[in-house]
Amino acid sequence: GLGMRGPGAVSRFTYIPGTQIVALCDYEKERAEKCQKYLKEASLPKAAVYSGDKGYEELCKRDDIDLVYIATDWLHHFPVAKCALENGKNVAIEVPSAMNLKECWELVDLSEKNRKHCMILENCCYDWFEMNTLNMAQHGVFGEVIRAQGAYIHNLAPFWKYYWKKGEDDKLGWRLDYNMRHRGDVYATHGLGPVAQALNIHRGDRMETLVAMDTKSVVGKDLVKENADSVCNSFRNGDHTTT
């Protein structure tokens, strides 16, 4: 995926000594080709380009790839990761790594079966503030941590029109369409990930139940009207969600 987020990942990889970027893939070939500029600027050789619905499958069959980095729309995270693991590749996935518990467990099983890493790229766990706070918690600065609160607020108003649209009939783009059709905390790990690390979740403790509660949707219908010029009678996701 080389739309909004993927190109930045390509650029960052060029700064890692010894890294070879051997292949680029996007549904739209033009987007993949545009990312060749980052390789050129770093004096790296051009990468092979794959595109279309199943381009990622051909990419994953290559025998010169160690890691597949996935930055597609959410619904393609799991199928691409599954394909990569089945082909013996390590996998790094932007959030969320899967769309339901069944997919989560399938990734765990595939990772263990094929002895390959499968990592969710929860960037909010690794900013300086979160890493510093985790270090303090691990060194007992806060004593025993018995309660924590995290949050993530992201105003997407400037970006709605830039999200990938599959064809001329797709007026909303994948992200607005998903929020229109689904309720809940669509990617809770930005706010929850750093808290989970401080609480040693899956390192001696675990969460058993999560409950997401949202407000009613006020701006959703207006977003559909603004971006697709059509009337929306049902926008499911609320304006604010608390888990």
Q: Which stretches of residues belong to each language-model region?
A:
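N-terminal Rossmann-like dinucleotide-binding module
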Residues: G1-A42, V195
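Non-transmembrane alpha-helical segments in soluble domains
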Residues: V10-S11, Q36, E57-C60, A81-L85, ...
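Acidic-histidine catalytic/liganding microenvironments
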Residues: F13-I16, R62, D127, H139
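Short, Asp-centered acidic motifs that coordinate Mg2+ and/or phosphate
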Residues: A23, L67, R147
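A short helix-to-beta-strand connector/capping loop
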Residues: E41-V49, K113-H117
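A structured beta-alpha segment of the ubiquitous adenosine-cofactor-binding alpha/beta core
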Residues: K46-I70
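Beta-strand-loop-alpha-helix segment that lines the small-molecule cofactor/substrate pocket
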Residues: L67, D73-W74, F78-Y126, G140
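Predominantly a Rossmann-like dinucleotide-binding segment in NAD(P)-dependent oxidoreductases
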Residues: N114-M119, C124-T242
